[in-house]
């Protein structure tokens, strides 16, 4: 029932097959568009890979948050980086207000190619995510940032840039603080970061 294609989102009409294919083609580059992180195998992480594992995180954590709309949360996680199909990924520590505006325009362009009710459903989700007024939006944002830190903890430390030694200890902490489970998880992640840094220093000594 949580993943029904009807109900509150009104998705009771099928997209025309060509509309579906065209939209999927527009998103295909997310499979190869790189992010700032490098995986444990030495491969540049893709935007799609980040969104996939973020969605898995959200799915696994649903029992911890019975008060939230889990369907909406997972939808947010799945779509949140659609704009990067046009803009590419920009690391958080480099992203400007102008970059944010460009990504918003990109989302508008992409969703504008969809028919209703799909267009309206996606645009409503993006508006809710941007407003950060609902618990679902704030939880998605916390998980989004935390997944990035988890990936950095998994990457070879030689791929880190200098500012990340501090950033990986603090990034997402403010977002996680609202949710006791995530606050504890973020503390555990920071300890993993400290241990990773300490191990690297020992190996260099």
Predicted regions and their residues:
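Alpha-helical, largely C-terminal catalytic domains
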Residues: 3-205
């Amino acid at each position: 029932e949580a993943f029904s294609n009807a109900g509150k989102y009104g998705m009771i009409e099928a997209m025309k097959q060509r509309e579906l294919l065209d939209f999927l083609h527009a998103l295909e580059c997310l499979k190869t568009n790189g992010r700032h992180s490098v995986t444990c195998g030495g491969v540049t992480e893709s935007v799609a890979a980040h969104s996939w594992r973020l969605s898995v995180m959200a799915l696994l954590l649903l029992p911890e948050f019975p008060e939230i709309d889990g369907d909406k949360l997972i939808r947010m996680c799945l779509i949140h980086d659609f704009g990067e199909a046009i803009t590419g990924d920009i690391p958080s520590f480099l992203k400007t207000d102008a970059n944010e505006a460009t990504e918003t325009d990109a989302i508008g362009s992409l969703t504008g190619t969809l028919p209703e009710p799909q267009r309206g459903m996606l645009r409503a989700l993006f508006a809710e995510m941007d407003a950060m007024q609902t618990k679902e939006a704030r939880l998605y944002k916390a998980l989004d940032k935390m997944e990035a830190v988890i990936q950095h903890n998994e990457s070879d430390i030689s791929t880190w840039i200098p500012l990340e030694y501090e950033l990986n200890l603090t990034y997402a902490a403010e977002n996680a603080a609202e949710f006791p489970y995530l606050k504890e998880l973020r503390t555990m992640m920071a300890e993993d970061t400290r241990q990773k840094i300490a191990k690297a220093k020992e190996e260099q000594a």
